[in-house]
């Protein structure tokens, strides 16, 4: 009987200790993972808008470089889909993808062909269709061989400047909300706030991790893979700018950082997480295929499928090992919300 009690105590003690660690880990995630990323996003978006003012030519190397840096900064935060990013559909205003009905090129073409005056200010432009806003709309204007030369050049220039300013305004608001009040709401739960306990706060972070991995596997990789008989390379994310693989690399790196910061002080679990993320990134780098064009070739397609399987292995570890450590129920589905 005594041995049984000791065994139970030993089993319960680690979970109690981790329960005491949860507030510290949540604060660590907020201050080391979330806030610096949104600050960088706001800074890079401001730089993009300023660059567009100086040179709005879609062939401009300076504009393309600033666009890439700002888009990278968004990818570094794109998994954090809660709180300030969801106010007024801000995340969708920055990143409307996948666009299954081709709404973005249609919306942009309509603006250009009619020379709609709504582009005169970013404030007014914030009322247009979300499909015509953000980084994916800007990719069409800069890299699409048709849209980049459609209509009046002066109007396209003004449109580029307005979209970049709209991006700056949106990311500045997200960063300000996180810095001024939402960080405190996540780290200091209350009965009147969005999180009533530290457990609810850590579940939000776990959901961001799980959903980010699921989106990478099912959408960023799943869409271009299609089926064996019908691969869809042109469904890859941002293939026009050659960034499809890069988006997965940045996202996995950000999720890696979140997973390790969220994990308890369990060396075996952390080693398992690090190994799984490193393996997926290594397989991704080995593709040497920026836009997943190789999915049409059976032998090369297998390599892309292996990357997807590697991401799914991370998801398994998150669900089966990390989830229970955090006290997230086994039946919790990241796509179901709270």
Annotate the PLM regions.
Residues 1-4:
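Positively charged n-region of N-terminal signal peptides that target proteins for export
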Residues 6-7, 17:
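Cleavable N-terminal signal peptides
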Residues 20-338:
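Mature extracytoplasmic or organellar-lumen-exposed domains after removal of signal/transit peptides
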């Amino acid at each position: 009987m005594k041995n049984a009690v000791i065994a139970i105590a030993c089993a319960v003690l680690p979970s109690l200790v981790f329960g005491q660690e949860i507030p510290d880990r949540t604060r660590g995630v907020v201050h080391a993972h979330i806030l610096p990323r949104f600050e960088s996003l706001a800074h890079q978006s401001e730089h993009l808008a300023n660059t567009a003012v100086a040179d709005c030519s879609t062939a401009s190397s300076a504009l393309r470089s600033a666009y890439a840096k700002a888009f990278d900064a968004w990818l570094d935060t794109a998994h954090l889909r809660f709180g300030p990013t969801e106010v007024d559909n801000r995340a969708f205003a920055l990143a409307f993808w996948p666009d299954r009905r081709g709404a973005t090129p249609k919306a942009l073409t309509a603006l250009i062909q009619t020379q709609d005056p709504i582009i005169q200010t970013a404030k007014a432009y914030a009322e247009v269709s979300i499909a015509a806003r953000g980084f994916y709309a800007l990719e069409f204007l800069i890299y699409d061989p048709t849209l980049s030369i459609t209509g009046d050049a002066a109007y396209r220039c003004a449109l580029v400047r307005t979209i970049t300013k709209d991006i700056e305004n949106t990311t500045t608001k997200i960063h300000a909300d996180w810095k001024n009040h939402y960080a405190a709401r996540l780290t200091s739960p209350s009965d009147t706030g969005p999180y009533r306990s530290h457990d609810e706060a850590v579940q939000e972070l776990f959901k961001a991790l799980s959903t980010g991995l699921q989106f990478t596997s099912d959408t960023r990789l799943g869409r271009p893979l299609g089926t064996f008989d019908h691969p869809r390379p042109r469904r890859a994310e941002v293939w026009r700018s050659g960034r499809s693989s890069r988006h997965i690399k940045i996202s996995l790196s950000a999720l890696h950082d979140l997973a390790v910061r969220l994990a308890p002080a369990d060396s075996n679990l952390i080693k398992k997480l690090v190994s799984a993320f490193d393996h997926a990134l290594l397989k991704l780098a080995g593709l040497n295929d920026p836009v997943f064009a190789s999915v049409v070739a059976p032998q090369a397609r297998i390599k892309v499928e292996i990357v997807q399987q590697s991401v799914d292995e991370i998801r398994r570890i998150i669900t089966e090992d990390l989830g229970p450590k955090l006290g997230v129920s086994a039946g919790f589905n990241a796509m179901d919300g709270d």
